[in-house]
Amino acid sequence: STPKPSSAASDVYKRQALYTELGRFMTGPYGHLVTRAIHEKHTYKEYIGVDACAVNLMRPAMYGAYHHITVLGKENEPCDHMYDVVGGLCENNDKFAIDRMLPKIDIGDIVYIHDTGAHGSAMGYNYNGKLRSAEVLLCEDGTHRLIRRAETPRDYFATLDFLPLMKPLFED
């Protein structure tokens, strides 16, 4: 006999699995990259160099992802300067923002890049010898906790086993 439509649909749903990637939904809005303006360049464009780079947040460099940027202490100032906000890698796509209207940024200003929780640190890498940054958790009561320390040069070389390669150099 032919199964009833409701019974057939029920059998199909029982065999189906649903998989989702909830990173951006669940954690995206809760991470932020805090960086400092350390360079400026005035050519045919205005560039602000920060002490973070694509190592810390690859999404804008990789596929042009938009992340809102706030210049701390200047939230109420007019966004009347157009900048490319760039990192220090030797790659032309190491940019957090292109032609972004922001308040005037001075050397030393804190540049706050929003919504980096899902794929900021998780996509990090050590290109150009850059070390991963520390991560700080801001708790609901206003306190903060270091949840991941910054990498050190020792960390960078920790998985490299080059002593066997060097042994012939020291043999007679």
Predicted region positions:
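Single conserved hydrophobic/aromatic residue that forms the stacking wall/gate
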Residues: S1-A9, Y13
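Charged (often Lys/Glu-rich) extended helix/loop segments that serve as interaction or gating elements
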Residues: R15-D172
